[in-house]
């Protein structure tokens, strides 16, 4: 959430 793309590429909001 909040654009956490750095989290193992596991994000709900892109």
From Swiss-Prot:
A GO MF label: alpha-amylase inhibitor activity
Keywords of the record: Alpha-amylase inhibitor
Function noted in UniProt: Inhibits insect alpha-amylases.
Entry protein name: Alpha-amylase inhibitor DR2
Source organism of this protein record: Delonix regia
